[in-house]
Amino acid sequence: MAQGCIFCDIIAGKIETEFVYEDDVVVAFADIRPIAPTHLLVVPREHHATLADTVASPGGTAVLGRLLKVAGHLGAARAEADGGYRVVINNGAAAGQTVYHLHVHVVSGRHFAWPPG
């Protein structure tokens, strides 16, 4: 757990949050500032600041695999009703990362243009 990390505080139970999914590696919960009708965050229990940090860490590949597997299951559960879903990882300030604890956004329920932005 990292000092001052909101996601670490959520995982530790210091901030009350309803998990829509949890296992021994990841948790998932609704984003407090959703950009779509469905906007979930899938977060590893272990603190990794960025995608790059996770890739470089021992066991990072397994963490990433679990994040994507859970994101895929959560997205697929809503895909039929929503017509599809988007999975996003923002890595670094220039990419829009605001919480420096790796997380995957699963968003659906509205049309998303390409390119994003």
Feature-to-residue mapping (PLM):
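HIT superfamily nucleotide-processing domains
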Residues: M1-G117
